[in-house]
A protein has these predicted regions:
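Short, small/polar-rich loop/turn modules that mediate ligand/substrate recognition or access, typified
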Residues: 172, 177, 234-236
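Substrate-binding pocket helix/loop in short-chain dehydrogenase/reductase
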Residues: 97-99, 103-108, 204
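Catalytic loop of short-chain dehydrogenase/reductase
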Residues: 91-93, 136-160, 164-173, 185-186
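A conserved structural motif in NAD(P)-dependent oxidoreductases
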Residues: 208-219, 230
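A glycine/serine/threonine-rich, flexible loop-to-helix segment
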Residues: 101, 149, 173, 183-208, ...
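A short, exposed helix-loop element centered on a Lys and neighboring polar residues
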Residues: 122-123, 165
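Short C-terminal tail/terminal secondary-structure segment
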Residues: 96, 207-210, 223-224, 235-248
Length: 248
């Protein structure tokens, strides 16, 4: 990825963090977006990117706001000197036993973060993406096998998988590839901050053939490969990493 310029949302932790560090190690300059309250984690990622000798740009802000999403892309392009990799990774996941427990405000928060934000960011980025550029979306095995307590989150991941395939057909003729990563049970802050019940956490990932949850670093190479030029025939694909579970 030498000389490539990447923007990653949710780059402060979990899979976004792992992808950002891996991109830097492969020679890319990286801009990460994150919620302002995650500044300490984000600054750690920035230092790790710089330690690889690459340019690192921190762009805090709330991607539920369309104007900010436009500013995010503009800042990334200006600071990096261009853009050719967009990783739409930020997500909101909250466990609710019943649909009756989800307020309209909570539902809207999930939709804005997981669906609206990629729409706004990709629209803003497209004028800057030249042939050979790549868009990567983080979906989930929840797109194929939704949990009953992740009603809102799971449907956003099904939508993510769908827009990956739709955009791949739309942008392929322009030389822009669009692919996705569908993680299974990966140990990230999403799980321990309300994304899973305490009961689930006790055996999180235990149902997979590998018998354990995955770590974000175990997915990083997928994000690298999908961004690499030698993956030039991968378009509209969703790559799974779920310890033997899941369908992709």
């Amino acid at each position: 990825l030498k000389g490539r310029k990447a923007l990653i949302t949710g780059g402060d932790s979990g899979m976004g963090r792992a992808a950002a560090i891996a991109y830097a190690r492969e020679g890319a300059d990286v801009a990460i977006n994150y919620f302002p309250t995650e500044e300490p984690d984000a600054l750690e990622v920035i230092e790790l990117i710089k330690a690889e000798g690459r340019k690192a740009i921190a762009i805090p802000g709330d991607i539920r706001d369309e104007d900010f999403c436009k500013k995010l892309v503009e800042t990334a392009v200006n600071e990096l000197g261009g853009l050719d990799i967009v990783v739409s990774n930020a997500g909101r996941q909250q466990s609710h036993a019943s649909i009756l427990d989800i307020s309209t405000e909570q539902f809207d928060w999930t939709m804005k973060t997981n669906i609206y934000a990629p729409f706004w960011i990709i629209k803003a980025a497209l004028p800057h993406l030249k042939p050979g550029s790549v868009i990567i979306g983080t979906t989930s095995e929840q797109a194929y096998d939704p949990s009953p307590d992740l009603y809102d989150y799971a449907q956003t991941k099904a939508a993510t998988m769908n827009y990956i395939k739709s955009l791949a057909k739309q942008l392929g003729p322009k030389g822009i590839r669009v692919n996705g990563v569908a993680p299974g049970p990966i140990w990230t802050p999403l799980q321990v901050s309300g994304g899973a019940t305490q009961k689930k956490l006790k055996n999180f990932g235990g149902q997979t053939p590998l018998g354990r949850p995955g770590q974000p670093a175990e997915l990083a190479s997928i994000y690298v490969q999908l961004a690499a030029d030698d993956a030039s025939y991968a378009n509209g694909q969703v790559y799974g990493s779920a310890g033997g579970s899941g369908q992709p």
